């Protein structure tokens, strides 16, 4: 098989998310919040990865845990009289179940629901940015990079998600964001340029507790997460430029490829999977 055929086959098998498995990004007891980095560090942006919604458009406890930490981190910057970071809310919907609808029958994006939650708790709307294109973790990484980080020239970014989701999140963001090669004039380098030896953007990660999930759900999700993380890290060794990544994502991935768009809306695989309760 060619390199692209191998990547395509992997994408067909491993496009979804799964529970947290211990990695350099997060460790410790079940449900513990784990931080990688300096608690006094200043960030230009905090990205919170979406984690699903209830059928009526509410946010589950493991998602509000992420957002409550983001509010604390935002307030820490303000209290220290540092420049307030942007808060990026990453996620549209999940491919694993139908999305709830908003006013007027429009899709209620997960990022919109998260923005409302933070706005109600005092985070200024002018400091929040949305990604309404991504449907999974690798999409979160790609669209936050290309829509927000590159145009704004960010160099220090904090990524927030739940403990069960951190392994795959770290694999996705480190793969995609480390492909970005800026040119000397501040614009993006040629799309096919190889990734630099040192990342242009410094990424930190924070894992929040798996609130609201029982052990059986976390165990089921963890099995899915482990497979997805392994597939991401394997693909990262074969897809090594941003141009190659875009080709891979938009021609092989179920959530983004026209070739596979008819697969969206088929939920049979997930109906009996306990992990569905974590989406």
Walk through the language-model features, giving the residues of each:
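A structural signal for short, hydrophobic/glycine-enriched beta-strand patches
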Residues: 2-228, 279
């Amino acid at each position: 098989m060619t390199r692209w055929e191998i990547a395509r086959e992997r994408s067909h098998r491993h496009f979804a998310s799964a529970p947290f498995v211990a990695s350099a990004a997060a460790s410790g007891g079940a449900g513990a919040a784990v931080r990688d980095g300096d608690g006094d560090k200043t960030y230009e942006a905090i990205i919170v990865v979406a984690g699903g919604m209830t059928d009526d458009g509410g946010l589950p406890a493991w998602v509000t845990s992420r957002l409550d930490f983001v509010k604390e981190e935002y307030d820490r910057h303000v209290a220290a009289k540092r420049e307030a970071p942007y808060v990026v809310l990453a996620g549209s919907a999940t491919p694993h179940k139908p999305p709830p609808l908003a006013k007027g029958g429009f899709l209620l994006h997960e990022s919109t629901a998260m923005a409302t939650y933070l706005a109600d708790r005092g985070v200024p709307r002018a400091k929040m940015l949305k990604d309404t294109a991504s449907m999974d973790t690798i999409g979160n990484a790609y669209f936050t990079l290309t829509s927000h980080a590159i145009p704004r020239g960010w160099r220090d970014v904090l990524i927030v998600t739940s403990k069960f989701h951190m392994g795959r999140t770290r694999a996705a963001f480190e793969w995609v964001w480390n492909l970005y090669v800026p040119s000397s004039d501040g614009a993006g380098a040629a799309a096919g340029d190889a990734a630099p030896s040192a990342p242009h953007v410094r990424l930190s990660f924070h894992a929040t507790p798996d609130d609201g999930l029982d052990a059986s759900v976390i165990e089921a999700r963890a099995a899915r997460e482990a497979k997805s993380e392994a597939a991401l890290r394997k693909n990262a060794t074969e897809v090594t430029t941003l141009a190659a990544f875009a080709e891979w994502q938009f021609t092989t991935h179920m959530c983004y490829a026209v070739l596979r768009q008819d697969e969206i809306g088929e939920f049979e695989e997930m109906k009996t999977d306990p992990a569905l309760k974590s989406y």
